[in-house]
């Protein structure tokens, strides 16, 4: 993904909350996905684009947040065929403290995701690029830079990503 494309995606997502994914559905029975059983969730963070006005985050923190969110969502499935989810963080912006109503930066994550068939040992799709923003919440309206830590923002973005990946898989 080119730097220009990454920043364009970051900018587009940062100005709109309409793309927020509500992920509070984890207490419900998951929609069936055939024989799906989560094998591994692997996350790679190699020199991601960091958007303007972003808090810093370590690669390890991103890996932990995304793997947790993927396992939280996909670990509920009990099929009999293993699949792996490989995620590459392409870019992000973690909202900094802003001025409510006047300037409320939004957090955004751009990631490429590939699904792998364990039995065949090969990917079942070309990398799918996802651009997600934080879960819709009252805090998001005033700016999560004021109300959440960077770790909380990353977990929210990771959960939105996992929800978007699930939606993609169900299509």
Briefly describe each language-model feature range.
Residues 21-35, 109, 114-128, 135, ...:
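Intrinsically disordered, low-complexity linear regions
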Residues 71-75, 94, 162, 166-170:
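Sec-exported extracytoplasmic/periplasmic mature domains
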Residues 20-64, 170:
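A structural "domain/chain start" motif
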Residues 76-124, 135-147:
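Surface-exposed short loop/turn segments
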Residues 56-81:
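N-terminal, post-signal-peptide region of Sec/Tat-exported proteins
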Residues 21-34, 146-171:
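Terminal low-complexity, intrinsically disordered regions
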Residues 50-56, 122-163:
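Short secondary-structure boundary motifs at beta->alpha junctions and helix caps
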